[in-house]
Structures are given as structure tokens and as C-alpha cells.
């Protein structure tokens, strides 16, 4: 029986392998005239009739991403404090509740007084009742009018 295809003699051998770098050549399928002509002609998006027009604003969308809730006027707070038409700060709840929005009357107060007033404004804002709104992904819009229109067109 043999020990394998060939028996190697004992000792060290050095083998030098030189690799020739391979060259990859790319060839254009079009001449230069056609390339510049294609760049000038941009492809335009064509919307299918099934794509939703976002509230008739010519903003086409294929899915829902958010729901707009318009601001509602405050009910009791505005009646108690009164509407102010001129341009100075009365500390209405509609003003920002961030720490950077300090009114002129807060300038003379100490840090603790300003903090207490800011926390009170924040508490009032959080206590305001807001009707719960469904998540956009939980409630789908009613497309029955759109479907009815398509059925009439098909007949």
C-alpha cells in the first residue's frame, strides 16, 4: 500500500508565487451622446388613481403617517382670564411652558419663586382636558366614497 499520491522529502522548501494583477475593463453600453441626453430627461413619477391625495393638497401619499388635530380654543381659562389683543405677556396658559420663556414679572423673583410659577403653569397645562385621539394605525380612513366612485366609473 502507498502512503499517498507522492511522498515529500524531508527538509524545507521555498516556493515563490508571483501574482499578476488582473485588469477589469468596463465598457459603456452607450456612446457619450446618449448618456448626456438621458441625464437631461428626468424620469417623472406617475401616480396611479388608487394613490391617496392628502387632503386635496396635491400631496400624493401611499400610506398614512400622521393625523392633524387642529388647535381648539380653551374653554374656561379664556373666559376667566379674558382675551388679550395687545402684545405683552399676561402669563396665559397658551404661552410656552419651557424654562426659557420667562415673563417681565418673573425677572424680580428668586429662582425658587420662578420655579414654583413654572411648575404651576405646567400643572395647569397638564390638567386641561383633551379628547383622546385614536392612533392613525388603529383607525383607518373611510374610503367608501372613493370606492363608490370607482364602481360607477367601471359600469
From Swiss-Prot:
Residues 1-47, 72-155 are annotated as: Disordered. Residues 116-127 have a biased composition (Basic residues). GO terms for molecular function: protein phosphatase 1 binding; protein serine/threonine phosphatase inhibitor activity. Signal peptide: none annotated. It comes from the Eukaryota. It holds the Pfam family PPI_Ypi1. Residues 145-155 have a biased composition (Basic and acidic residues). Residues 75-84 have a biased composition (Acidic residues). The keyword ATP-binding does not apply. GO terms for cellular component: nucleus. PANTHER family: E3 UBIQUITIN-PROTEIN LIGASE PPP1R11 (PTHR20835:SF0), E3 UBIQUITIN-PROTEIN LIGASE PPP1R11-RELATED (PTHR20835). This is Type 1 phosphatases regulator YPI1. The gene is YPI1.
Amino acid at each position: 500500500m502507498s502512503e499517498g499520491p507522492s511522498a515529500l522529502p524531508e527538509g524545507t522548501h521555498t516556493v515563490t508565487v508571483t501574482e499578476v494583477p488582473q485588469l477589469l475593463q468596463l465598457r459603456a453600453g452607450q456612446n457619450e451622446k446618449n448618456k448626456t441626453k438621458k441625464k437631461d430627461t428626468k424620469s417623472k413619477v406617475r401616480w396611479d388613481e388608487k394613490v391617496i391625495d392628502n387632503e386635496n393638497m396635491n400631496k400624493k401619499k401611499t400610506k398614512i403617517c400622521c393625523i392633524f388635530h387642529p388647535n381648539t380654543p380653551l374653554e374656561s381659562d379664556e373666559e376667566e382670564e379674558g382675551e388679550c389683543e395687545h402684545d405683552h405677556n399676561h402669563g396665559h396658559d397658551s404661552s410656552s411652558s419651557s424654562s426659557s420663556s420667562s415673563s417681565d414679572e418673573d425677572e424680580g423673583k428668586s429662582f425658587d419663586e420662578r420655579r414654583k410659577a413654572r411648575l404651576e403653569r405646567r400643572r395647569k397645562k397638564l390638567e386641561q382636558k383633551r379628547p383622546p385621539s385614536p392612533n392613525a394605525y388603529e383607525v383607518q380612513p373611510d374610503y367608501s366614497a372613493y370606492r363608490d366612485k370607482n364602481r360607477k366609473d367601471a359600469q
